Amino acid sequence: ESKKLVILGDMNADCNYASLNELDALSIRKSNFTWVVPDDADTTFSSTRCAYDRIILDEQISSSYTGWWGIDREMSNSSVSDHFPVWFELLRPSSSLNQ
């Protein structure tokens, strides 16, 4: 069985930490990866508008990605983090439904 890869988390991949030009120069941006959270998203509840939190899917898992993703703005607790949780939806493989 082939491996599937999801990369997610706070990557500081925006604003002062990484410009769009720097991000676009990364090989992972030019390859067969899907960046779920767009560059113009705001994943923090600070006064900045930065997409620090990212979800990146490899080509194999991208085929199961429904296109639905979001930022859970209801879950904000600054004692834990200054970031909102990000989420995405995958289709369940039909072969796993018969088990």
Tell me what each language-model feature is.
Residues 1-6, 13-99:
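Metal-dependent phosphoester-hydrolase catalytic domains
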